[in-house]
Amino acid sequence: MPSAGRPFTTALVTELVSRGILLAPITLHTGVASPEAHEPPYAERYAVPGTTASLVDHVRATGGRVIAVGTTVVRALETAATSGRVVASAGFTEHLVTPDTGVRAVDGLITGLHEPRSTHLMMLTAIAGTPLLTQTYEAALEEGYLWHEFGDLNLLLP
């Protein structure tokens, strides 16, 4: 299971849905993240079904926000959004999200805290921007939050 999805118990998902939050499935086969700045993330297998692609496009077109749960979800959606719209897509993604590439399919991200200079941190910067990300990490250090796969999660919502 992707680590960002661990807190999503049946009870939490039920509560979110009861409050009108829409959830959309994506199939992910996650890899092991490398903390090294010079190492790109490994290719990861994914599948974005047509219903999910349509829902993401509809939510964004009507002014809603798409919040990804985990960095692999971002990679999958961004891979499926090469035309500016998210389309049904499946395969392996090697897409690297950076401040230079930006994001087209997500507005926010629930994720763990990632190591400095990692490719995951570049993705977080692309989504949240440097000021918000700096503030988030300073607070995490000050409060003693735990890092990465078995650590604490945060919501990045610029």
Q: Residues of each region from the PLM?
A:
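Surface-exposed, charge/polar-rich loops and edge strands
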Residues: 1-158
